[in-house]
Amino acid sequence: MYVMPSVKRIQKKSPLHGMSCCVITFLVLIVIVWVYGWNVVDDNHTTPQAQHSFIQRRPYDANKCAVSSISDLSDDELRPKAGRRHMVTPPQGGKLALVCCETTKGNMNLLIHQKWAPIGVARFLEMVESNYFETRVPLFRCTDACQFGLAGDPEFTKRFNTRLQDDPMWLPPGIDHRQNERGVKRFPQGYYTYAGGGNDSRNNQFVLTLKPNQFMGGGSPWEVPMGELVGNESFDTIAKIYTGYGEKGPSQGLLRREGNSIKVKTDWPLLDYITSCGVVDETELPE
């Protein structure tokens, strides 16, 4: 906290004394705002964990991915409904963010739906805009689904390690809803959600389904989907991700401590990584 230096009282003040004090006070306020930034919350602006602005974002080359604009997406991708891919109709409308991610096996697009999981979406987009994935995030646990999120730089992992409140689950729970009468499984290929270990346990780790999965989301509110892959390139990319290490990739403890250390690169040389992510387009759809 800035503390003004004390000034001895004098008997006769200069005519400019009052003006000088005002100027000094103004300069101090400018410095405080420059260092700490505005932190104003009112009825229309909520904290990052509650709502993403969908306005300010860092520059990112939209041409890195095959889908560079939301206008390139089909209506089925923008407004998915129950059918051959989705077991149930997801929440409709609201704000959408198109994210492009580069990986060591190619690029992929994620369409993030704020209405699917508003709290989780806000955290993920905050991580994207903080250059989190530019630290080379390892895809360290990949079988039929791929778990990742621990940063290549442990300081980034620590920064986003705080837990989030669960969003409401909109998929049907229980063993009776692992798949429907048409054989559509609860989690189709390319659904994107958080990894967790209990209620309100989401923080900085995610799961992307490489194949349709009937078990996820069955009674785990932290696994509510927040988006899905879109575009043919994305599905071509995840088909190439190395899954040979399975459950025997680097431990979470090792990655938390060391990130992409020499040991990780040496002991798991075939591990794939996400090397960057950025928001390339955004829009809002009516319900």
What are these regions (language model features)?
Residues 2-287:
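Cyclophilin-like peptidyl-prolyl cis-trans isomerases
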